[in-house]
A protein has these predicted regions:
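Extracytosolic (periplasmic/ER-lumenal) interhelical loops and adjacent juxtamembrane/interface segments
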Residues: 53-57
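Hydrophobic transmembrane alpha-helices
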Residues: 1-51
Length: 167
C-alpha cells in the first residue's frame, strides 16, 4: 500500500470517527442512524477505502460504544462481511448506481449480526432489533448515496464514463 492510500484511509477513518462522535446518541443500540455509515459507499469507487472505514468503525466502537467488547467483534465483523459481499459483486457490476444499491443491501441485510450482538449483550429481541437496525442502515445508506455519488465523481472520474453507467 502506498503512502497516498494510507493517508487517504487515515483521513477516512478520522472522518468516520468524528461523525460518529457527533451523532453518538443515534449511532448505537437497537435504533440506529449512524450517519457515518454513508461513507461505506466509498468502497464503490476504490476497494482500498474499505480499510479506512473498517478502522473508523473499530475506533468509533472502541471510543463510544456502550458495549465495547461486543461492538469490536460484531460491529467490525458486520462491516467486513458487507464489504466482502460488495467487493465480490463489483467484479460483475460496473454501473455505479447498481454498485451503490448492492452495497446498501449488503449493509442492510448484514445488520442481522448487529441484532445478534444486541441480543447477546443487552437481551434485545432479535427479529425486532434486526428490523429496526436494518431500517436505520437502509435510510442512511440510501439517503447518503447521492452525496457519495457526487463525491465519487471527484475521486474516481474513470467510473463515470458511458461504459460504467450502462448507457
Amino acid at each position: 500500500m502506498n503512502v497516498r492510500t494510507m493517508a487517504t484511509n487515515g483521513l477516512i477513518a478520522a472522518v468516520y470517527i468524528a461523525v460518529t462522535a457527533l451523532i453518538q446518541p443515534f449511532g448505537f443500540t437497537n435504533i440506529q442512524f449512524r450517519v457515518s455509515e454513508l461513507l461505506n459507499h466509498l468502497v464503490v469507487f476504490r476497494q482500498t477505502y474499505a480499510i479506512g472505514i473498517v478502522l473508523g468503525v473499530f475506533f468509533a466502537n472502541l471510543f463510544f460504544s456502550p458495549i465495547v467488547a461486543y461492538d469490536l467483534v460484531f460491529g467490525v465483523g458486520q462491516s467486513v462481511l458487507a464489504f466482502l459481499i460488495t467487493i465480490v459483486s463489483m467484479r460483475y457490476i460496473k454501473n455505479v448506481w447498481a454498485r451503490m444499491a448492492v452495497n446498501t443491501l449488503s449493509f442492510t441485510v448484514t445488520m442481522g449480526l448487529i441484532a445478534l450482538e444486541l441480543k447477546l449483550a443487552l437481551g434485545f429481541p432479535f427479529w425486532l432489533t434486526w428490523l429496526t437496525t436494518a431500517i436505520g442502515e437502509f435510510v442512511v445508506m440510501a439517503l447518503g448515496a447521492p452525496i457519495m455519488y457526487a463525491v465519487g465523481r471527484r475521486l474516481a472520474p474513470e467510473l463515470f464514463n458511458s461504459a460504467h453507467q450502462g448507457r
